[in-house]
């Protein structure tokens, strides 16, 4: 497989994923985030753990209080940081990841008031995490882009683009100013822009 064909294939899958998104569910997720009084916690396992961490980083950089919740740490004491005012967003291709399910189940046992949302690409009915979520957002991924159709390439790209798009939408909706954005970024090239 040539790299440019893989690149092109990912773009096609992203277009398909966008066209198949159930807009009312996207709106529901946006509304859920906007109505959250506490923090957002993104959680995922494996490659989707990196997706979750990137989402939390982007949201927080746009002045939306967000954190990455490591699933192993969560099951060994870190659940203490999640309160009834928070929203937990899980990322899983299958919706059946055992570690993510364990986190969701532990959160449910801790409090029925904690909001849990699952973002996944499993269109079958065997989705354990979805069963204990408040609601879920299905992201259509027709196939991965590798020779085995198993390496999480297209799914990671689709989840990442979705979260980046939501972050910008929400920051704009909340009226994030350039001054506030720059205040939160005193370092690097962005930090130099504030001094100009």
What residue spans do the PLM features occupy?
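Catalytic cores of large soluble enzymes that bind and process phosphate-bearing ligands
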Residues: 2, 6, 21, 47, ...
């Amino acid at each position: 497989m040539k790299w440019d064909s893989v690149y092109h294939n990912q773009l096609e899958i992203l277009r398909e994923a966008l066209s198949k998104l159930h807009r009312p569910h996207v709106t529901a997720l946006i509304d859920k985030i906007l109505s959250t009084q506490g923090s957002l916690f993104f959680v995922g396992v494996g490659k989707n753990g990196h997706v979750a961490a990137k989402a939390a980083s982007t949201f927080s950089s746009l002045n939306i209080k967000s954190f990455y919740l490591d699933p192993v740490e969560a099951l060994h004491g870190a659940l203490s940081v999640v309160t009834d005012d928070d929203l937990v967003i899980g990322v899983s291709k299958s919706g059946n990841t055992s570690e993510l399910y364990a986190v969701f189940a532990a959160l449910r046992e801790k409090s029925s008031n904690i909001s849990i949302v699952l973002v996944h690409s499993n269109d079958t009915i065997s989705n354990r995490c979805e069963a204990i979520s408040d609601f879920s957002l299905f992201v259509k991924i027709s196939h991965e882009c590798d020779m085995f159709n198993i390496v999480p390439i297209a799914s990671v790209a689709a989840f990442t683009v979705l979260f980046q798009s939501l972050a910008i939408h929400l920051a704009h909706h909340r009226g994030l100013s350039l001054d506030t954005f720059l205040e939160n970024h005193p370092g690097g090239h962005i930090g130099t822009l504030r001094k100009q």
